[in-house]
């Protein structure tokens, strides 16, 4: 009903999405634009009142984003803070209308590139008014996917503790998580096999 009233052009796009998580992503951006507030995924435990996150946005900043502890230099779309009618979300909503990239051949890549973090970071890098976006410190969500069961959020700046969720993830999500958490091992293995190949070729 909200889409029909405020963004009717999004209705056919939402219907074409193959996965429910894509529709959930789009709706969160629309609601943040219309009403503002604090959005977070269900797989978080609140450690304290979240109102200070919204109150701490610097003057002139309408949107607050949280760094992804899984990807250096990127933000996550699982925790979003905004005042109502922040223009940034219109850029994000428009980006969800674009065609999927050619390389988005698995569910994880498709979701991330069309409505998820890849798309959000692409919009953020192209946004012409970066001074209107506040990036919170990593300590707001101090854990990553590799240490969920061991992480202890004890810092004074920690607001949220992620827990194991991943309700929409599929086999490729599990694979990418494993590769990320074992990147050092993979790098060592690649170097080892390259050296073996070079040694074999020189004989």
Model-derived segments and spans:
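Glycosyltransferase-associated regions of secretory-pathway enzymes
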Residues: 1-24, 40-203
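Small-residue hinge/turn detector
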Residues: 25-37
């Amino acid at each position: 009903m909200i889409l029909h009233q405020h963004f009717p052009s999004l209705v056919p796009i939402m219907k074409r999405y193959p996965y429910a998580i894509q529709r959930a992503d789009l709706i969160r951006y629309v609601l943040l634009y219309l009403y503002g507030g604090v959005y977070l995924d269900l797989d978080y435990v609140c450690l304290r009142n979240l109102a200070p996150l919204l109150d701490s946005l610097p003057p002139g900043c309408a949107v607050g984003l949280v760094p992804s502890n899984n990807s250096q230099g990127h933000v996550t779309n699982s925790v979003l803070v905004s005042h109502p009618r922040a223009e940034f979300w219109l850029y994000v909503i428009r980006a969800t209308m674009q065609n999927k990239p050619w390389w988005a051949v698995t569910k994880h890549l498709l979701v991330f590139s069309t409505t998820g973090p890849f798309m959000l970071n692409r919009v953020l890098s192209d946004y012409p008014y970066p001074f209107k976006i506040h990036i919170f410190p990593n300590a707001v969500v101090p854990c990553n996917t590799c240490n969920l069961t061991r992480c202890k959020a004890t810092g004074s700046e920690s607001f949220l503790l992620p827990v194991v969720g991943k309700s929409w993830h599929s086999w490729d999500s599990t694979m990418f998580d494993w590769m990320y958490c074992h990147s050092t091992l993979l790098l060592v293995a690649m170097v080892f096999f390259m050296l073996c190949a070079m040694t074999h070729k020189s004989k």
